[in-house]
Every structure is written in C-alpha cells, then in structure tokens.
Amino acid sequence: MAARLCTRCLPPVWLCRQAWQGQGRHYRAALCTELKQPLTIQEVAPRPVGPQEVRVDVHFCGVNFADILACRGQYQEKPPLPFTPGMEFSGAVLETGTDVSTVKKGDRVIGVSSFHAMAEQCITDQKTLWRIPENVSLQDAAVLPVSYGTAILAVDHRARIQPGETVLVTAAAGATGLAVIDVATNVFRAKVIAATGSDEKCKLAVQRGAQFSVNYSQGSLRDAVKKLAGSGGVNVAIDMVGGDVFLESLRSLAWEGRIVVLGFAGGNIASVPSNLLLLKNISAMGLYWGRYQHQDFAVFSKSMSTAMQYCQQGLIHPHTGAVFKLEKINDAFLHVMQRKSTGKVLLSLK
C-alpha cells in the first residue's frame, strides 16, 4: 500500500463532478482516461474470450484504495490509459473459452482481475475464478477476495495465530481490519484488541467481534494496550497504519511476539528498531497478498477457497460498509479517500 492520499490536494473537479454516462450499444464500464481526473462511464465494445478465459456478468465490484492510486498514477502497477479499474468482483458466467473446464455458463463466481472489474462485464482467466456456494450471496462473496484473502494469509500463513493468543489489529474498522478481526476471533479463537482512530470505529470493531478497542488518536497506543493485555504484551500485531502506530505496536509485543505489516495507511513508513527484535526475540514480517498470485499461486488460491469455505460454514461474516451504483464511482472514490468508509465499499452493477 502506498502513502495516504490527502483530499485537500485533490483537483476541485473531483469534488463536484459526476461520472458521465456515455451512449452506445454494448456494456458500461468505468474508464480512467486521464490521471487525477474523474472517471467516466462509457459504452465498451465486448471482445472475444480467449481459450482459457471466461466472460462474467458482474454484479458487485470491490472498491479498493489501490484502484484510486492507480487512477492517480501512484500505484506500483501502472496500466496504460485508458483503463478500467477494479480488482475483485462477483457475478455469473456468461461465456467460456474453448479450453475452460473449471466453470460453466450460469455459475455464480467471485474473481480477481488486474484492473478490469468496474464494468458490467469482465473477462478473466479461468484460474482466477472461484464458484460461490448456494448459501453465500453475491454481495457477501464480493467482500471476500482482497480483504479476507489478506486476512487469512496474515492470521494463518504468516502470523500462525494460536487459540487464546492476544492479537492487536490497527486500522481495525477498515475492510481488511474487520476481516482480520472476523477470522482471528471466529476461526482461530484469538482475543483481539482493535485499534482505530475514532470512538465510532472502535464501537464498530467491538460489534464485529473484537474483545477490546483503543482509540489511538487520544493517547499512547502502547499504554492502552498494556492496560488491556498486561505487562507481557500481545502475542501478535497486525498493522496497516505504519509510522508511529507501527512502532507502538512493535513495542506492545510480548516475548517471541510476531508483527505483520499489511500497509501504510497513515502515510509514513517507519524504520524497524532491530534491537527490539533481538531483545524480545520478535519476528517482523510483511504480507502483500496480491504478490502471491504470481509468486505462489497455490497459496493465493487456497486463501480464496478457504475464505469461501469459512463463509459457507457460517464461521465468518463479511461486512459491507457502503454500496454505490456504477455511475456514482467518483462518489465511491471520495468516500474512501475522505476516510468515511468502514468495512468494504462495493459498486453495484445491477
């Protein structure tokens, strides 16, 4: 995750313009035609599917901070203009390529895509689609890929959280933060201390399963955690804020504690004081979920299928904070940038 975006630096046009509805005979898509400018809604001509590809009728699409950064030219991946943002979606299969064997027409699926999903149709490789069980809604399924894929790898694959351990989660009211709380509490039976920047967000985190909450805008996070966890500290910290919050989380760890870095929503990247790692035998590690798609697809795919399995079994409860129509895409971006969002923000294509 890159640095926090300051809305005071936005072009005024972002704050007042609606997406433009184009005319045509094909399907609608949100297009970034110029960096740092509002997206437009235009009619797009469909292209043929390749042998391994699947065309999906998109019902819901997740709105992620990475989409916003990409539309400003600030993301590590820089798709050529014009492009359609959107990395995760749910929908129904419309058409399959000649060599597709994993899904068939009519199947309900979730999928991941490299900036194609904010459209009424999306074409993606068959291996990046997973079928949705009958008892899971398309809306709940759309929440799973980025947030719960990340949460599952953070909690299990990286931190290896054990039942009864105490876990500190920062940025706990965001989509990924709530997913970490959900997985850690309801699947791994850990005790969660949720850290957020407001009392309202603290309340939401507790409602969603955290045992305790801390508003780190009102004082020392380390002192507050010490009162809740005791002098020994927490076993695991999962940080998405960076800067001073990361450092206080690190200092809140117990002997042989583990800290997992998921991002830098606060805009600052802290230097790790390695003496603390030595003195407490602490393990510090990072997690970039999307990278597993290219480096270790088996791990990536398992995180998706596991999220779906947990949802099917009723172990986890995906939380949607807001839903916008496709033509309100610029409002959805502002909602995220101005830190109004809690939980997953979705676009509805229906």
From Swiss-Prot:
GO terms for cellular component: mitochondrion. The keyword Zinc does not apply. It is an enzyme of class 1 (oxidoreductase). Transmembrane segments: none annotated. This is Quinone oxidoreductase-like protein 2. The modification N6-succinyllysine is found at K201. GO terms for molecular function: oxidoreductase activity. Gene3D superfamilies: Medium-chain alcohol dehydrogenases, catalytic domain, NAD(P)-binding Rossmann-like Domain. Belongs to the zinc-containing alcohol dehydrogenase family. Quinone oxidoreductase subfamily. The modification N6-acetyllysine is found at K36, K302, K328. Keywords: Acetylation, Oxidoreductase. Its EC number is 1.-.-.-.
